[in-house]
Every structure is written in structure tokens, then in C-alpha cells.
């Protein structure tokens, strides 16, 4: 994000999933993390839902202004160690940039030099979680 501070990496990441939607659902997937599995369409939807849930939660939370560090608690409900904070902050900002690109969030440079983020819609409904429990069966169908 520092090299391209206005980048929208989450939009690119979500767009990349469209290329995988053409794969037959019985394709064997060999992921970089986790065990091989069959069920690409279900897994793609889980990943998309996970990020859309975060986007909804951030939009709901930002009906009052917050900076990205404050929003880490919203996205990551566990304690982050020092090595995780920078990565988590990048992910949080990526979500905020996508919300700005969608016209749902505005950013303001405050007097202290820190950006605050505020939802355009002040009446955002409380988010309803799309993402269900990760289906353990996906990894067992190999």
C-alpha cells in the first residue's frame, strides 16, 4: 500500500476469482495453504462471503469516523502480535479502499495527519453474516 497508496488490491483479488468460476466443481484444487480439495465453487463463495462480511461490518462501524488502526479490532477479533499488525493494517486499508471505490466510504485527512474513514450512508443496517462455518467436508472429499 505504501508504494501505491491509492491502490485497490481487494477489488483486484475479488475480480481474480471470476477466472476460477469457469472451473468444473469436481476439479482437484491444490491450494498454497491447507489440504487439496474438490469443491472449488463452494470455496470461492466462502472466500468472497468472508470479505463481503468484513466490508459490511466496516461500513456499519464507520457511521462514525474511525482511523484504520481503530478498525483492526473490528476485522480481527483476536490479539495481533507485532509481526501481524502491519499485514492486518494493509488488509484493513484494502477493504476501506474498496468501500471508497464502491462509493460507500469517504476518507478525510485529519489535523494530526491520520486518515479517518466514514460511511456515506449514516443509516447502515447491522450486518447479517453471509459466511457460514467453513465446510470441513470440502477438504475431505478428495
What is the predicted role of each segment?
Residues 59-142:
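C-terminal regulatory/interaction regions
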Residues 1-55:
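Metallo-beta-lactamase
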Amino acid at each position: 500500500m505504501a508504494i501505491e497508496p491509492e491502490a485497490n488490491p481487494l477489488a483486484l483479488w475479488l475480480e481474480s476469482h471470476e477466472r476460477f468460476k469457469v472451473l468444473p466443481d469436481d476439479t482437484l484444487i491444490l491450494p498454497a495453504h491447507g489440504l487439496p480439495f474438490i469443491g472449488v465453487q463452494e470455496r470461492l463463495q466462502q472466500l468472497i462471503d468472508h470479505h463481503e462480511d468484513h466490508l459490511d461490518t466496516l461500513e456499519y462501524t464507520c457511521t462514525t469516523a474511525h482511523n484504520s488502526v481503530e478498525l483492526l479490532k473490528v476485522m480481527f477479533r483476536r490479539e495481533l502480535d507485532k509481526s501481524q499488525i502491519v499485514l492486518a493494517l494493509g488488509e484493513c486499508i484494502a477493504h476501506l479502499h474498496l468501500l471508497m471505490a464502491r462509493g460507500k466510504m469517504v476518507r478525510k485527512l485529519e489535523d494530526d495527519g491520520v486518515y479517518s474513514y466514514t460511511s456515506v450512508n449514516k443509516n447502515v443496517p447491522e450486518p447479517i453474516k453471509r459466511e457460514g462455518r467453513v465446510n470441513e467436508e470440502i477438504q475431505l472429499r478428495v
